[in-house]
A protein has these predicted regions:
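Basic helix-turn-helix/winged-helix DNA-binding cores
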Residues: 1-72
Length: 72
């Protein structure tokens, strides 16, 4: 079964953030987001779930450093 892939704009809409926020979180948190043959990011449902968790933790006041520790 093939995994559903989402473009960054679709993933950002699902998480209700701007695309630059997803890229920032990827960089700051060391997240491994797959890329296609052209180097474009694509996201899975698991990636979106992870971003929703990150957003929830940010809204609760956690800093990215603490979130990174929780994720790794």
């Amino acid at each position: 079964m093939e995994k559903v892939r989402y473009m960054i704009s679709d993933a950002a809409a699902a998480v209700d953030v701007e695309t630059h926020v997803l890229r920032y979180w990827e960089d700051e948190l060391g997240l491994d987001v797959p890329r296609n043959e052209l180097g474009h990011r694509y996201y899975t449902r698991d990636n979106i779930k992870q971003f929703l968790r990150i957003k929830e933790l940010k809204e609760k006041g956690y800093q990215l450093r603490a979130i990174r520790d929780m994720l790794h």
